[in-house]
Amino acid sequence: GMRSPVAHPGIVVYPLVALCLMLKVEAPGGSQRDLSDPALEWHILLSLTAYALLALAAMQSIILAIQEKQLRNKHAGGLVRKLPPLQTMEKALFQLLYTGFILLTLGLITGFLFVDDFIAQHLAHKTVFSIIAWLVFAGLLWGRKQYGWRSQTAVKWTLSGFGFLLLAYVGSKFVLEVLIQS
């Protein structure tokens, strides 16, 4: 259950998703969809929630790496002393990863429902990097189950997966608005 001393991720995720939905802007170029379409709303909600959870997982993995390094070097002070034990922090990381992965999977599936013209809708960059991110997270979760991957391995895979996800969303926006529009 959520009785661990780690805060529930919904405290951060839900307001972040709401903010993203309020600030959403039309994608440059391509065909615009009716945003009142409930299926598209589900796609957006699933995708933004997955992104927020996986962003939290990336932050959690950085904290876990710092905590582990300070404990290993016997320099645990300040914030690290106030954190839950490593095992609890790692469990929280994988809870975020599993939930984010499920939502990312659903977001990708629902996204494919809206593809009319992959190139004209400027979806190639976003889709390719999202699928690479999905594969990285799938590999990490499989490695955890199959080989018991933990700590630094989990940190590296989490940050790699989130890096690809970041490239999918921020990178595609940069490519469309800066490189292609120039």
Feature-to-residue mapping (PLM):
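Transmembrane alpha-helix boundary signature
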Residues: G1-I11, L23-L35
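Transmembrane alpha-helical segments of integral membrane proteins
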Residues: L108-F112, W134-W149
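Short alpha-helical packing/oligomerization segments
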Residues: L113-G139
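Interfacial loop-to-transmembrane junctions
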Residues: G143-F164
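Juxtamembrane boundary at the C-terminal end of a transmembrane helix
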Residues: L167-S182
